[in-house]
From Swiss-Prot:
The gene is accD. Keywords: ATP-binding, Cytoplasm, Fatty acid biosynthesis, Fatty acid metabolism, Lipid biosynthesis, Lipid metabolism, Metal-binding, Nucleotide-binding, Transferase, Zinc, Zinc-finger. PROSITE patterns: COA_CT_NTER. Its EC number is 2.1.3.15. Pathway: Lipid metabolism; malonyl-CoA biosynthesis; malonyl-CoA from acetyl-CoA: step 1/1. Gene3D superfamilies: 2-enoyl-CoA Hydratase, Chain A, domain 1. It is an enzyme of class 2 (transferase). Residues 286-311 are annotated as: Disordered. This is Acetyl-coenzyme A carboxylase carboxyl transferase subunit beta. A zinc finger (C4-type) spans 31-53. NCBIfam families: accD (TIGR00515). Binds 1 zinc ion per subunit. The lineage of its organism: Bacteria, Pseudomonadati, Pseudomonadota, Gammaproteobacteria, Chromatiales.
Length: 311
């Protein structure tokens, strides 16, 4: 107890202690970019985008899809597919133990969630990586769920949207994991042959085998602001080439400037913007856009030189 607290009457000390205990844990959080203290419910309403600086924080797969798709009519694809330890792999820990830990921590069976639903009334199939599940790494289950989602989109002739957030292929599955790069790419080739649109949304981070396969195969490739996108990480590249990388290297803005992606879209505008784009690509009428971002929010047009073309 501090000297100031000792001088306080006991009743005041008790009241202050009770007020402190009445504040729920996790009610406040801190922005890792601008260090602003944020009210957690407000941050959740803002889709995990800092209302002070616009930093796009990482968000879980189900929360992302819930904010992207219409609330009604969502049907999960491939929920029955479960991972197995076919190689009985072990590094510092058994693979099956890592799976159990990730499943307990996230509530997911693996690192990809696939949903069939509607986007502003338009039928779509959407998939999202769960980065909290072993770094969103792509193994057999991720590949199988993605292929099922792509096949569903192809059979029903509805657009496919993928939100990538992955460190790459899952090393614990060896060649089974690497094969998913070819497997998912082949599924997207079949989708393309049928003329069904595929939009790839790159979020922070999209790296390794995922960036080298499905993530870059979209008819439209967009990214969230500030997303780290590449194959090897910047530290690995610097150690290999022994040179200092340019500022912002591998960030979404750098890739847009150099023509590697098509647009940068604010997460809060993602559903409306992609709905309008997909309506144009599928020759459907677009529903009215939702309200514009509130004052102080950063619209994506500031980093989107081709936005007018798609709008």
């Amino acid at each position: 107890m501090s000297w100031f607290q000792k001088l306080m009457p006991s009743r005041i000390r008790t009241d202050a202690s009770e007020r402190s205990r009445s504040v729920p844990e996790g009610l406040w959080t801190k922005c890792g970019h601008c260090s602003a203290v944020l009210y957690r419910p407000e941050l959740e309403r803002n889709q995990e985008v800092c209302p002070k600086c616009g930093d796009h924080m990482r968000i879980g797969a189900r929360r992302r899809l819930a904010g992207f798709l219409d609330a009604e009519g969502q049907v999960e694809i491939g929920a029955d597919v479960q991972p197995v330890d076919a190689l009985r792999f072990r590094d510092s820990k058994k693979y099956r133990d890592r799976l159990a830990q990730a499943q307990k921590g996230t509530g997911e069976r693996d690192a990809l969630v696939a949903m069939q639903g509607r986007l502003r009334g338009m039928p779509v199939v959407a998939v999202a990586f769960e980065f909290s599940f072993m770094g969103g790494s792509m193994g057999s289950v991720v590949g199988e769920r993605f292929v099922r989602a792509a096949d569903t989109a192809r059979e029903q002739r509805v657009p496919l949207v993928c939100f990538s957030a992955s460190g790459g292929a899952r090393m614990q599955e060896g060649l089974f994991s690497l094969m998913q790069m070819a497997k998912t790419s082949a599924a997207l080739a079949r989708l393309s042959e049928e003329g069904v649109p595929f939009v790839s949304v790159l979020t922070d981070p999209t790296m390794g085998g995922v960036s080298a396969s499905l993530a870059m195969l979209g008819d439209l490739v967009v990214a969230e602001p500030g997303a780290l996108i590449g194959f090897a990480g910047p530290r690995v590249i610097e150690q290999t080439v022994r040179e200092t990388l340019p500022e912002g290297f591998q960030r979404a803005e750098f890739l847009l400037e150099h023509g590697a992606i098509d647009q940068i879209i604010d997460r809060r505008e993602m559903a409306d913007r992609l709905h309008r784009i997909l309506a144009m690509l599928t020759h459907q009428p677009a529903a009215e856009a939702a309200d514009a971002p509130e004052a102080g929010e950063q619209p994506s047009e500031a980093t989107d030189p081709v936005g007018e073309h798609w709008d």
